[in-house]
Amino acid sequence: GLGDVYKRQVNKTSLRVRFSEVDSMQIVWHGEYVRYFEDGREAFGREFAGLGYMDIHASGYTAPIVELQLQYKKPLRVNDTAVVETRYIATEAAKICFEYTIRSATDGEIVAEGSSTQVFLDARGELQLLAPEFYRKWKERWDVK
């Protein structure tokens, strides 16, 4: 069922907070979480082949972020380890939608949550209102409804 598909299209990738990512309060600077989400998308694209940035580019498209939501729950500090869970959210629209949960690797507590939406632009920079063929094929391959 759809619940199985939803559970199946999840990537988990680990990270360790680097010194360069913290601010003067010794916690991860808020903007770094956007990069952690990107790390999650990249890992997702490697696991679910065909939806990585280079796959999209090779198909003649770009997929810029047009919406990003981020909610901070608990700070991370230098050398903390965390797990970024990236979930693909199926949609009929010509968009790529993800939800993210970042958890502390030590206690499993949620440190941040969010979502992103990407659209498709062709080589001329034109917004695609219909899903590109490579995206439709990717959905078929991974049994996305």
Q: Where are the regions a protein language model picked out?
A:
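Short, small-residue-biased leader/transition segments that mark boundaries at the very start
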Residues: 1-6
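Terminal targeting signals and extreme-terminal segments of soluble enzymes
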Residues: 7-83, 89-145
